[in-house]
Amino acid sequence: MNMDRREFLKKAGLGAAVLGIGACAPRVLGDDDAKSRAVPDGKMASHYDGIGLLGYGCMRWPVIEGEDGRSHINQAEVNNLVDYALEHGVNYFDTSPVYLEGDSERATAEALNRHPRGEWLLATKLSNFSDFSYDNSVKMYRKSLEIFKTDHVDYYLLHALSGGDDFKRRFGDTGIMDFLLKERELGHIRNLGFSFHGPDSGFMEMMELHDKYHWDFVQIQMNYVDWTHSGKGNASAEFMYGELDSREIPIIIMEPLRGGRLADLPAALSDVLKAREPKNSLASWAFRFAGSFPRVKCVLSGMTYMNHLQDNLSTFLDFKPLTDEEKELLEITAEQMENYPLVRCTGCQYCMPCPYGINIPAIFKFYNGNVNAGTYVVSKEQKGYAKIRRKYLLEYNKSIPGVRQADHCISCGHCVSACPQKIAIPHELRRIDKYIETLKREDF
């Protein structure tokens, strides 16, 4: 850092807010402020011809409760979102056979197939996690083509690789990689790449395969926290970007908001960013960070609601790369986030279903939301202690049915290997359950 942190934060407008983290008052923050931003006229930002810089992640489509009492994708709303996105220059749609309990591809295809094939780019994945046999993998690939009524996939990904051994087990030894290379040669796969969750060493193993397979693109988790604070077991985005950039491999970015967490910052941190750009959402800072790197081909966002889409469009249709000073401010924000007892969950739901019925993502989301809002009890002497305690316990029971709460975890470990963020899920569930029991007993 070229500047003293206190001096820098003072210049940002609210330095004391960040430095005095423990003093933040209860306050609910989120991306609702996105509603106030108008979508400007203009052309979608782009670093590569033919592809908009903002892409649509199709893992978080809106759902409604059906007559059977279960949640179903709201197809009418998906259609509206897709229409609006295409109208404003979003043309890259990323899905997978396993998203939304296997229904994402169908819903996405139903919306997109109402438009000419040349107007949209399809990105989907070979998500052969449990059965990675040749026959099953070919079946999964052909099923995607069938669902989208197309003879080609624009961007096809080997889904969620962690390194060379994982690649060899799922794609190399099975012979499916030879099949995919032939499909690329025939033009049925226009671009072949992979998405990655794993350590530096695993990423380098995949880079060493570039000379043999010539990756057309790679999808990585990149945001201003994971740039240098990626957490135990995962390569930093800075490292991966550098390796890809040096090989001139285009990059697709996933989790630019870290599962929505960067659109819902603790009050002390959000106040600093709001002081700098009062009219802009917290999410816009994260998207400007992701879109400021020239090797980035597309930044994915799982835009569940129209206000999310409109807010992101207002960022990318009038795109302004971050200044060096703004990058420094976000690095300080990322460092300060380490001081909060948050769970690093992005809500991807790869850990689900839990064999014992625990709603893992919902528990983490509820807990993180209260930490961010300042409604996290530290001691009985805390201002508003009784009200905060009662509210937390009531809303926890209301949000998450008793049989799906953290105290039902038996530490079977079924979820651990599935987590891309390498979260020690049973440990975190025990920690949250212990906190809840402390609230009940008032034993601080």
Task: Describe each model-derived feature in a short phrase.
Residues 2-120, 179, 185:
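N-terminal binding-site loop/beta-alpha segment at the start of enzyme catalytic domains
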Residues 106-116, 208-218, 270-271, 313-319:
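Short, electropositive alpha-helical surface patch
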